Amino acid sequence: MQHEHIYFSVRMRAAQGGSHEQGGKHISGGEKIVPYHDLSSCMAELAEKGLNHSRGKPDFMNIQFEQIEEAVKYVSPLPVGTHVVSSVADGQATARSLLTEAGIKPQVIEEAYYVLSELTELRGALFIDAATGQRLDDPIKNGVRVTRMDWPLDDFSCWLNEHQLSPNIRMKEALALATKVTQHPATIAELCWSDDPDYITGYVASQKFGYQRISQLKELGEEKGCRIFFVDQTKMKNLDAYINYLTTQPVLIRWKQEVMADESRSMAGRAAE
């Protein structure tokens, strides 16, 4: 069997005080899509991430991999912008402004913030109906975890160099997730900030304006994160189909190949002139 042309989905989750299902505190999680020959190093990397995390030391960790049977979807990363703010209040005001620009009504935005405020911990994404502000996902499950997406490091490094940005693995992971989520036509916008106490940057993402980083969306030391998807139910078959896309459709981000393709098309066009 030729493994080199087959991809595997690798997932890690770590908790403290027992497993997540037993009510343990979420410590860390990770997602990778890799060929067979990278499985060993990938699992070691995810284990290291879970064992050395600012949220604490886990006493439970699960790492699993499975061969991907579905066709992998290759997509270009969202365009990126950055908003430097001086306070959490300014950052949150910027987030609200961007959500409004994406087409979310102010009352729906405030309803989403209220739903978030009632939760003590969020392990995945909340779904908010962009028309009504109603929460659509199952509250018992405490959020839907998006899986099966990645951005190969060599391609990401080329993207960083082109955009003159410093290496940032957090951005790599977040931009890969946001790109997958907003590829679905039902996702109008995503609002996110990390549950890591030492990371205060967050973002709003939308197909309308890309991935907009906001330098501060919470106070340093705060462990409560946020991930909200504002969705248009008229653009999905049903909620189960939307969740199925988020949790099972494999997506790999490709930037370098798209640039090369654009250059080839441009050269072909000039040659034809």
UniProtKB/Swiss-Prot annotation:
Pathway: Metabolic intermediate metabolism; pimeloyl-CoA biosynthesis; pimeloyl-CoA from pimelate: step 1/1. InterPro entries: BioW. One of its GO terms (molecular function) is 6-carboxyhexanoate-CoA ligase activity. Coiled coil: none annotated. Keywords: ATP-binding, Biotin biosynthesis, Ligase, Magnesium, Nucleotide-binding. It catalyses: heptanedioate + ATP + CoA = 6-carboxyhexanoyl-CoA + AMP + diphosphate. Pfam families: BioW. GO terms for biological process: biotin biosynthetic process. Catalyzes the transformation of pimelate into pimeloyl-CoA with concomitant hydrolysis of ATP to AMP. Homodimer. This is 6-carboxyhexanoate--CoA ligase.
